[in-house]
Amino acid sequence: EEIEVLDLPATGGLSFRWRGCWPKLAMFKSRLLDGVDLALYLDLDVVIVGSLDPIIDHARKNAGLHILREWNPSIWGLVPLSWRPDRGGQSSMVAWRPGEQDHLFADVLADPEPAYKRWRNDQRYIQQKARDGHYFPPDFGISFRRHCVWHYPLNLIFRKVKKPKGPAVVVFHGKPKPSDLTRDDQSRWGTKYRYGFGPVDWVKAYWRRGLDAPKKVRAPADLDDQGRARHLSS
C-alpha cells in the first residue's frame, strides 16, 4: 500500500517536552489534515491484531473525540469497570474529526507552561480539554503488560503469551517495548512483577513484517500541483 507522508508542523517550545509527549499535540494543528473526514491516531509502539473497521465505524457514528481509558492496576480488574477509579485518557489511540479539536494544539502552543503544570502530559490534557470527549469501548484496545502477561508468580507457570482474539489493538506503554519481544535469546523483559523471557511469536512476526516490508512512501515533495504523485521512493 502507498503511504502519503505529511510533515508535522513546528511545535515551538513543545519540541523540548518529549517527557509528557507534548509534541504529539501537533496532530491537532488547524488545516494539517484538510480533506480528511476522520482521523485515527495510533502510537508507533502498538500491535494491530484485528480489523480497525469497528473502531472507525464507532468514531463515525459518535461525535466528538475518542480516546482509550487508562488501565487500572491488577487488583481493580476483578471489579466492574464502573467501579474502578478513572485514571484519565490513554493517548496511544485517538480518533477525531479534523477541524473540531484545533484548540488542543493552538491553546498549548500559545501558553504552554500552565498546561505543563496542570496536566503534566498530553493524554490528560487531551482527555480533559477535548470538545465532546469520550472513551473508546474497553474491548477496542488492551494493554500488553496488563492483559497479556500474567502477574508473578503465575507468569512462571503460564509462560506462553497468547495472541488476544477480541481487541484490535495491543498497546505497549512503559515496559516492555515490542522490540524487546523480538530477540532470539531468552532474555528477560517486562516489569518487576509482570515479565517474561524470550521472543513472543506473534509480536515478533508483526514487528519483523513492518521492518522487512518494501517501503513505498509518498512524500509531500513528490506531489505535483494537482496532488498527483511524481514518483514513489523506496
What kind of region is each of these model predictions?
Residues L81-R97:
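Conserved core of the sugar-phosphate nucleotidyltransferase
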Residues I48-D86:
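Conserved donor-nucleotide/metal-binding helix-loop-beta segment in metal-dependent transferases, i.e.
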Residues A39:
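Short aromatic/hydrophobic "clamp" motif used to bind/position activated sugar donors
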Residues L14-F16, L78-R84, L156-F158:
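Short, P/G- and charge-enriched loop/turn segments at secondary-structure junctions
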Residues W96-S234:
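A glycosyltransferase accessory/donor-loop signature
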Residues D43-V47:
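The conserved acidic donor/metal-binding loop of glycosyltransferases
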Residues E1-G35:
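Active-site-proximal specificity loops/subdomain of glycosyltransferases
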Residues A59, D86-G88, K160-K165:
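Extracellular/periplasmic catalytic domains that process cell-envelope and extracellular macromolecules
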